[in-house]
Amino acid sequence: MAPSATLPLTTAILAIGRLVAAQQPGTSTPEVHPKLTTYKCTTSGGCVAQDTSVVLDWNYRWMHDANYNSCTVNGGVNTTLCPDEATCGKNCYIEGVDYAASGVTASGSTLTLNQYMPSSSGGYSSVSPRLYLLGPDGEYVMLKLNGQELSFDVDLSALPCGENGSLYLSQMDENGGANQYNTAGANYGSGYCDAQCPVQTWRNGTLNTSGQGFCCNEMDILEGNSRANALTPHSCTATACDSAGCGFNPYGSGYPNYFGPGDTVDTSKTFTIITQFNTDNGSPSGNLVSITRKYRQNGVDIPSAKPGGDTISSCPSASAYGGLATMGKALSSGMVLVFSIWNDNSQYMNWLDSGRAGPCSSTEGNPSNILANNPGTHVVYSNIRWGDIGSTTNSTGGNPPPPPPPASSTTFSTTRRSSTTSSSPSCTQTHWGQCGGIGYTGCKTCTSGTTCQYGNDYYSQCL
């Protein structure tokens, strides 16, 4: 997962033809979604290319009134412009984004995300993008993976200790929570939720006047870097979640030489991750009973870390939330595919790659170290495909995707970073909050570990 954020962006949801005056698209820069080809596969027909793209999260975007006064201040909203949902929807325009400047590039079936980008004032700014898979209709692609599998190629070689390249599923609404006050919806990255129950200014596309967190089922397919990785389901009820989850981490499960540069899964090179959601009757209509992780590299299947297979078949911490059965229902109804890259100013990502979890030292993941030594850190996802179990890596039948470049259960509980919350009443701006810009009157001092980074004349942000 990735934390909530806020960046200046722009417009162009007009093509879906259902806009009214409510969190209206702005006019500064068109919202042009980067095309990302993905593949849907069957055992009988092979893999068929899908017309898909990616969209940057709503919370990264600049929102303003007709006079370019910011609709957000001090991590919340400008109560003059946004005293209630209806008035805010009428007054505020949400802008699109320059995807390249936000660290995002896509070509064919390949998506590259950068943690840092050169700053106009010199040095680098942390951009930490989070994106969602979008269909040609301007709504999120809903992946229904119960009794199915998801495969993708990934290059983690440029992610050092402390970085997290994440690819996961979130049970967001297909339309991004679009409603009468927010017609931008999924086309502008609205409606994010996860098992950390983040508290955001907008909750499922609507002004969050109550300050509630937004919880939903989350399936972390990959959280990792070149030194460690975890596969973790997070089941939820309507108001609470198994935020820690029961993950499978090879290092944390007693296999320290399985995943890393030069190891069994050699992270100095591109490899394929296959995640299978197994049901009791072997079909999408069954109950989810286990989740299995597999790897391929250079076209060869890699043996599992654990002799009985790298499988999660139970999750004690999730029992209060329905366990794997709850996750299976979410996978059956459809979940949104999320891509992100981020690092961690508070815990240095120790829960992922240090101590019991990995070989990194407790301070190696400090973002200041990453920036000093690896300003070009990035992750590359490619050849994303989903469908019948066994179909996504089968080279026979239909039109397969391009080849990748040249049972016992073990679970590993992690302590996750805290979720994004409302800003402090003191005049110190939170991480990701606005800290400057023409007409901005809120707090300009950023919380410890972040600095105020210029985005444009109307928007600067604590990063």
Swiss-Prot record:
**Where, per UniProt, does this protein localize?**
Secreted
Could you say which EC number(s) this protein's record lists? 3.2.1.4
**What is the top-level taxon of the source organism?**
Eukaryota
Q: Where is this region: Linker?
A: 402-427
User: Which cellular components does GO assign to this protein?
Assistant: extracellular region
Every CBM1 domain range: 427-463
Q: Which GO terms describe its molecular function?
A: cellulase activity; cellulose binding
Look up keyword Signal and say if it applies.
yes
* Recorded catalytic activity of this chain's protein: Endohydrolysis of (1->4)-beta-D-glucosidic linkages in cellulose, lichenin and cereal beta-D-glucans
Q: Mind telling me which PROSITE patterns this protein's record contains?
A: CBM1_1, CBM1_2
UniProt keyword annotation of Secreted present: yes
Give start-end of the signal peptide. Answer: 1-22
Catalytic residues per the record?
E218, E223
> Keywords, A to Z?
Carbohydrate metabolism, Cellulose degradation, Disulfide bond, Glycoprotein, Glycosidase, Hydrolase, Polysaccharide degradation, Secreted, Signal
Q: Where is the composition biased (Low complexity)?
A: 408-429
Disulfide pairs here are C435-C452, C446-C462
Residue ranges of region Disordered? Answer: 390-429
| Spans annotated as Catalytic | 23-397
Q: Which InterPro entries match?
A: CBD_sf (IPR035971), Cellulose-bd_dom_fun (IPR000254), ConA-like_dom_sf (IPR013320), Glyco_hydro_7 (IPR001722), Glyco_hydro_7_sf (IPR037019)
- Which residues does the record list as glycosylated? N78, N164, N204, N208, N394
- A GO biological process held by the record: cellulose catabolic process
What does it do? The biological conversion of cellulose to glucose generally requires three types of hydrolytic enzymes: (1) Endoglucanases which cut internal beta-1,4-glucosidic bonds; (2) Exocellobiohydrolases that cut the disaccharide cellobiose from the non-reducing end of the cellulose polymer chain; (3) Beta-1,4-glucosidases which hydrolyze the cellobiose and other short cello-oligosaccharides to glucose.
- Family to which the UniProt record says this protein belongs: Belongs to the glycosyl hydrolase 7 (cellulase C) family.
Q: What protein am I looking at? A: Endoglucanase EG-1
Q: What taxonomic classification does the UniProt entry list for its organism? A: Eukaryota, Fungi, Dikarya, Ascomycota, Pezizomycotina
